[in-house]
Amino acid sequence: MRDVFEMMDRYGHEQVIFCRHPQTGLKAIIALHNTTAGPALGGCRMIPYASTDEALEDVLRLSKGMTYKCSLADVDFGGGKMVIIGDPKKDKSPELFRVIGRFVGGLNGRFYTGTDMGTNPEDFVHAARESKSFAGLPKSYGGKGDTSIPTALGVFHGMRATARFLWGTDQLKGRVVAIQGVGKVGERLLQLLVEVGAYCKIADIDSVRCEQLKEKYGDKVQLVDVNRIHKESCDIFSPCAKGGVVNDDTIDEFRCLAIVGSANNQLVEDRHGALLQKRSICYAPDYLVNAGGLIQVADELEGFHEERVLAKTEAIYDMVLDIFHRAKNENITTCEAADRIVMERLKKLTDIRRILLEDPRNSARR
């Protein structure tokens, strides 16, 4: 196994926790990246990783991304993530998630989590019986419902801001958008785009789902092969499925003017952002435009107010514009511009939180 501390240094992490429970078969890793802004927040995914090293690399990379996403979304949480090493189709059990509830609860409010790839809200109903460190539960258990709605809305606002930057108007009527992946988020995004008069090309590994959407929206939708959707001529390419779609193999194949989508970690490496810029393709950082779901979950932990969630999600529009203009003015990539904003915000918070609120020894004396 690789040197864990070396990896933590590379990504800038505070804490990594390995969780094991032989009776349920649980093997999991929790990573807390940065808690300057508040408790760590991030989803819990379940994947049959090939090795512990692969799982560790994933949880470190994803939790760092959550720090940036929380900062840009202006929520008082830091970045965290949990990964379970296992097959979600056969390794789940109520007992396994109750054990997760104990491990996460044992962090005493330093980490909050919920659904991600391979997990669903119903899984965490069991975990929530053991601690209050879970968000995104079903409505019947006190949660606030499907996060795909605000996620899609945030991507939509990101597209509007991109259109304004590129074409001087945020109207998407008549624009061609190629959507890669029409799952929960992709389908809701498709609906929003069709409603404002955009034309959409769609692709998904679920061909039946695509056919159903074609039947629903008619000539507003064109079906495309899932292996060539990124090569389609369009105004905006929107990756809403797997990450890593911008890589050495695809970088010269894009025929779009902008990339704005909900998929996480769309760039395989930072240098791919510079390569997109060289090709005059405008890239909206994924960890900003897909932050709508995070905004809802964070607000749920603070009491939840629907109008506040909508307002913060709509603010993605202004932040995307700010990043585009900053990147242009400073001759840097959009990701570099976003990262600078995050670092500036965290520095300000660090300066503010140097002030001691209470001597912990006072509590001990009570």
Curated annotation (Swiss-Prot):
Keywords: NAD, Oxidoreductase
Pathway membership, UniProt: Amino-acid biosynthesis; L-phenylalanine biosynthesis; L-phenylalanine from phenylpyruvate (PDH route): step 1/1
EC number in record: 1.4.1.20
InterPro entries reported in the protein's UniProt record: Aminoacid_DH-like_N_sf, Glu/Leu/Phe/Val/Trp_DH, Glu/Leu/Phe/Val/Trp_DH_C, Glu/Leu/Phe/Val/Trp_DH_dimer, Glu/Leu/Phe/Val_DH_AS, Glu/Phe/Leu/Val/Trp_DH_bac/arc, NAD(P)-bd_dom_sf
Listed CDD domains: NAD_bind_Leu_Phe_Val_DH (cd01075)
Enzyme class: oxidoreductase
GO terms under biological process: L-phenylalanine biosynthetic process
Catalytic activity: L-phenylalanine + NAD(+) + H2O = 3-phenylpyruvate + NH4(+) + NADH + H(+)
Positions of the catalytic residues: 81
Binding-site positions, L-phenylalanine: 69, 264
Reported temperature dependence: Thermostable.
UniProt KW Signal keyword: no
Positions that bind NAD(+): 45, 116, 151, 181-187, 204-205, 241-242, 262-264
Annotated GO MF terms: phenylalanine dehydrogenase activity
Family of this protein: Belongs to the Glu/Leu/Phe/Val dehydrogenases family.
Biological role: Catalyzes the reversible NAD(+)-dependent oxidative deamination of L-phenylalanine to phenylpyruvate.
Protein name: Phenylalanine dehydrogenase
Name of the coding gene: pdh
